[in-house]
Curated annotation (Swiss-Prot):
Superkingdom, natural source: Bacteria
UniProt organism field: Deinococcus geothermalis (strain DSM 11300 / CIP 105573 / AG-3a)
Presence of the UniProt keyword Iron in the record: no
Example of a GO MF term: zinc ion binding
Gene that this sequence comes from: allB
Binding sites annotated in the UniProt record for Zn(2+) 1: 59, 61, 146, 311
Protein name: Allantoinase
Documented EC number(s): 3.5.2.5
Coiled coil: none
Similarity annotation: Belongs to the metallo-dependent hydrolases superfamily. Allantoinase family.
Cofactor(s) needed for function: Zn(2+)
Length: 449
């Protein structure tokens, strides 16, 4: 007997889209066939809907413990599952204290085990003061180590100098874990910001001038050189320029172990939009011009970009309402919108449905060792997202399940809506409802092959 039998959905799999039934036993997919026979404890009619693997967001900031007034794991994970996500990996810096050792790691893990509606992995930090703690973070189950090549925005999460980064990469290599880097040149961004502010610059355009594309390109080039020299696995987060992606793709072609991430906001918005909408679109690296948006989409179609992470990083309203744009918190609330953006903008830009499933689920799960996640195959976890591809809708504040009801996507028309999300077969979201309490589990990365 099946625990769950999903009937007649259009299953989005690696090889294409097929109408089929899907059977689940003890939280896992056990069988896929055009028509399954047998009894089931629950039967779900998916005719007319597309069934995607649950999205895996490898880059979120849910700010717990310590800053739950900014977001929190409960509200952040509710928004994730409402947007079709079933797994997230939380970054180490915005919790208080940041995740720099086993004690802080386990405190975050325990909070997530209480509060999360999705399964989860956790990043550890890489800073000048915790090089000796990387082995214990690996032992605790960190999915990798996050570091900043420019100022993180928080004094308690310092950026490593090149020596620290070099040493950290050597350790990460030996531990078999990935180093994720925010790649912007600190010297360039700090120097320009100081000069522009000294001249009285406080606006959006001034902020954009303080973080030019060369700051990203220079840092990416340096990060790739360090990864090539050390043999470390490198993950470049939120790339915003075509030149940076090209550098990384060329390095990969010559054998550097590098993966490339961009974010939905770099695929949807420009610096002009930031001038129009203001603080809701402030991020670092900043938004670029339309030619860079086109270059990123071209890189996705070419297979150079591996993952799409939301980089969800909200704050309290007071931090978004500063008169000086340099003092506005730089973070975009987008965890609920990643799959929706891909279903709308991605299809318009020529992506197939299997492409979308690969970017949002299969590749991040596989690359980061999250066993059983990201695919619709026998043996995989029954993480399912039912989508009405033809439904057009306008994003309103009432749709949001984050703590703060602001998002750059409000008022935008989308095509394709998440109807239901299942985590290991159980409904965690259905048409605005969350029928069960949090049941998220901690995911340790599988050992590197």
């Amino acid at each position: 007997m099946y625990d769950l039998l999903v009937r007649g959905g259009q299953l989005v799999r690696e090889g294409g889209v097929e109408q089929a039934d899907l059977g689940v036993v003890e939280e896992r997919i056990v069988e896929i066939a055009p028509e399954l026979m047998g009894d089931a404890r629950e039967e779900l009619d998916a005719r007319g809907l597309h069934v995607f693997p649950g999205a895996v967001d490898i880059h979120v900031h849910f700010n717990e413990p310590g800053r739950t007034d900014w977001e929190g794991i409960r509200t952040g994970s509710r928004a994730l599952v409402a947007g079709g996500g079933t797994v997230f990996a939380d970054m180490p810096l915005n919790s208080t204290p940041p995740v720099l050792d086993r004690t802080t790691f386990e405190a975050k893990q325990q909070a997530a085990e209480r509060e999360s509606y999705a399964d989860f992995a956790l990043w550890g930090g890489l800073t000048p003061r915790n090089l000796d703690r990387l082995p214990e973070l690996a032992e605790a189950g960190a999915v990798g180590f996050k570091a900043f090549m420019s100022h993180s925005g928080l004094e308690e999460f310092e950026s490593p100098d090149d020596f620290t980064l070099y040493e950290g990469m050597l350790q990460a290599r030996d531990l078999g874990l990935i180093v994720a880097l925010h790649a912007e040149s600190d010297a360039i961004t700090r120097g320009l910001s100081t000069r522009i502010r000294r001249e009285g610059g406080t606006g959006v355009r001034d902020y954009l001038r303080s973080r030019p594309a060369i700051a990203e390109v220079e840092a990416v080039n340096r990060a790739l050189l360090l990864a090539e020299e050390t043999g470390a696995k490198l993950h470049l987060v939120h790339l915003s320029t075509g030149r940076a992606v090209t550098l990384a793709a060329e390095a990969r072609a010559r054998g550097v172990d590098v993966s490339i991430e961009t974010c939905p906001h770099y695929l949807c918005f420009t610096g002009e939009d930031m001038e129009r909408l203001g603080a809701v679109l402030k991020c670092a690296p900043p938004l670029r011009d339309a030619s860079e948006v086109d270059a990123l989409w071209q890189a996705i179609r070419a297979g150079h970009i591996d993952t799409i992470g939301s980089d969800h990083s909200p704050s309290t309203l007071d931090l978004k309402e500063r008169a000086d744009f340099f003092e506005v918190w730089g973070g975009i609330a987008g965890v609920q919108s990643t799959l929706t953006v891909l279903l709308t903008e991605g299809r318009e830009r020529g992506l197939s449905l299997p492409d979308i499933a690969r970017l949002s689920a299969r590749t991040p799960a596989g690359h980061f060792g999250l066993a059983g996640k990201g695919r619709l195959e026998p043996g995989a976890d029954a993480d399912l997202v039912l989508v009405d591809l033809d439904r057009e809708w306008v994003h309103t504040p009432e749709d949001l399940h984050t703590r703060w009801k602001f998002s750059p996507y409000l008022g935008r028309t989308f095509r394709g809506r998440v109807v239901q999300t299942r985590l290991r077969g159980q409904t965690v979201y259905a048409e605005g409802r969350f029928p069960h309490p949090p049941q998220g589990r901690f995911l340790r990365p599988a050992p590197a092959s």
